[in-house]
């Protein structure tokens, strides 16, 4: 897994070699750091999760409908400093894929992406806790109703297969199938300004060798307001508001209860500065106040969660 992780990282960095003005290769590379301060579910002296990630895409001008996409990610849990994880777990993710999109009419664009996501979780002793391979099929479309209004939908179907877990966990098969939906609109009301609103839903159906239903579902409305405040600066306000049943999981593993619920809404703001059309800096902060968790035993706990992000977008 580490060899694959390193190889994908080298491929991402190697894409910069094509950043010549006359090259037929175009794309972007986006390094990102995120601090998830969940206070470790309320425990004292807990440290945040540090997320480091590189995402990007690569296109060849002779084949404009095809795009290679990738993500390389590392999560360090319960660690005081970046790359200093001595007590917590570390998760690695490699997420390559290929996307085909085509403009069918002047207003309608159709697309299909195929992605293969590998994840590995290690403890502080570098012992493997689990590996999971996820196959993903992602159809999407966008439709320009007017020059200002666009409708869009993306549906992701996935299958997760777990490997290399402890004998106790391996005795209970926990592969899963699921889907994720984004569907909404974008309205551009001024140059460089837009309002976006998406309905988002994720559903997972866990598989067991000898157990019954085990499902989870999460539903949100996700609005974003983007305001260009100057030639080089943009401010974006966004939210993630739970609707319907919110975030719920049913688990039939012999616990006291079979239902887990979590209520949380996120409020965030991003500050975007364009040094040039090809070099962009983005920093942001978000909070989920008064998160309410109802566990399987019926006990209710409340937390305040915070997220701090920074990323660089380099286009070539």
Each predicted region: which residue ranges?
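Repeated loop/turn-to-beta-strand initiation elements of outer-membrane beta-barrel proteins
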Residues: 25-27, 62-68, 105-112, 147-153, ...
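Outer-membrane beta-barrel "beta-signal"
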Residues: 285, 302-316
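Detector for outer-membrane/organellar transmembrane beta-barrel domains
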Residues: 142-254
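Cleavable N-terminal export/targeting peptides
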Residues: 1-30, 63-67
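Residues on the lipid-exposed face of transmembrane beta-strands in outer-membrane beta-barrel proteins
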Residues: 54-60, 96-102, 139-143, 181-187, ...
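Outer-membrane beta-barrel proteins
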Residues: 38-42, 77-81, 119-125, 160-166, ...
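Transmembrane beta-barrel strands of outer-membrane/channel proteins
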Residues: 29-37, 68-74, 112-118, 153-159, ...
């Amino acid at each position: 897994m580490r060899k694959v992780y390193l190889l994908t990282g080298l491929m991402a960095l190697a894409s910069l070699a094509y950043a010549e003005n006359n090259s037929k290769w175009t794309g972007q590379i986006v390094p990102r750091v995120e601090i998830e301060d969940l206070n470790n579910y309320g425990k004292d002296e807990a440290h945040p999760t540090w997320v480091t990630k590189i995402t990007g895409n690569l296109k060849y001008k002779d084949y404009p409908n095809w795009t290679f996409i990738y993500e390389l990610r590392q999560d360090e849990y319960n660690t005081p400093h970046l790359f200093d994880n001595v007590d917590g777990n570390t998760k690695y993710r490699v997420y390559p894929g290929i996307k085909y999109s085509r403009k069918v009419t002047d207003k309608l664009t159709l697309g299909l992406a195929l992605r293969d996501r590998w994840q590995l979780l290690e403890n502080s002793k570098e012992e493997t806790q689990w590996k999971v391979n996820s196959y993903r099929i992602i159809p999407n479309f966008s439709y320009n109703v007017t020059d200002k209004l666009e409708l869009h939908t993306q549906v992701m179907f996935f299958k997760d297969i777990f490997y290399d877990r402890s004998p106790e966990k391996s005795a209970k098969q926990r592969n899963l199938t699921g889907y994720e939906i984004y569907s909404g609109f974008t309205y551009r009301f001024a140059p460089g300004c837009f309002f976006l609103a998406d309905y988002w839903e994720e559903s997972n159906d866990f598989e067991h060798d000898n157990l019954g239903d085990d499902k989870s579902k999460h539903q949100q409305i996700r609005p974003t307001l983007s305001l260009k405040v100057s030639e080089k600066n943009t401010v974006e306000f966004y939210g993630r508001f739970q609707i319907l049943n919110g975030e719920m999981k049913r688990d039939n593993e012999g616990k006291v209860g079979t239902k887990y619920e979590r209520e949380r809404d996120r409020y965030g703001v991003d500050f975007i500065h364009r040094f040039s059309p090809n070099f962009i800096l983005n920093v942001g902060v978000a909070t989920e106040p008064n998160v309410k968790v109802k566990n399987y035993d019926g006990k209710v706990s409340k937390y305040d969660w915070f997220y701090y992000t920074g990323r660089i977008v380099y286009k070539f």
